[in-house]
């Protein structure tokens, strides 16, 4: 069980957060939702998830990889503690990875929208994460990476009115 709060930062309309990040003062933690920890291989839930491969988001809603009723058990931050596959990463002063370990964990996750995270960028909790992110961007640019900013599009369908 991890002591520090982790943050699932996503669109305000997201209902199934599947990743979160934290910094404990030494390590960057990246958490991925871990339904495989409780879904039995070849069970109906497993077979259905493998057949779908991913959650499909369409204007009318979402065709979920895992059933809607399972969502609270597998998404991050919908319960007090969430099961996760967690990557503990030690970074050097430039943000390059020095060491990485993987653990099955229980994590406390606070959900934030992108807008909320931006407002809290200078807060004690999020400032280290933003610093790590900016170092990573700079390191990638120095290595020749090209950054393309694309607008995010969200389409919703309203019921037809007569």
Question: Model-found features: residue ranges?
Answer:
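Electropositive polyanion-binding surfaces
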Residues: 1-162
């Amino acid at each position: 069980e991890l002591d520090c709060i982790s943050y699932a930062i996503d669109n305000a309309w997201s209902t199934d957060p599947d990743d979160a990040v934290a910094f404990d003062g030494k390590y960057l933690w990246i958490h991925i939702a871990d339904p495989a920890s409780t879904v039995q291989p070849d069970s109906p839930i497993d077979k259905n998830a493998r057949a779908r491969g991913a959650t499909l988001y369409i204007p009318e809603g979402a065709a979920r990889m895992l059933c809607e009723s399972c969502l609270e058990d597998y998404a991050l931050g919908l319960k007090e503690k969430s099961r996760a596959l967690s990557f503990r990463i030690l970074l050097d002063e430039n943000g390059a990875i020095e060491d990485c370990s993987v653990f099955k964990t229980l994590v406390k996750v606070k959900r934030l929208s992108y807008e909320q995270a931006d407002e809290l960028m200078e807060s004690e909790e999020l400032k280290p994460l933003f610093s790590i992110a900016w170092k990573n961007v700079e390191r990638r640019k120095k290595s020749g990476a090209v950054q393309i900013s694309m607008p995010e599009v969200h389409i919703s369908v309203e019921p037809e009115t007569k």
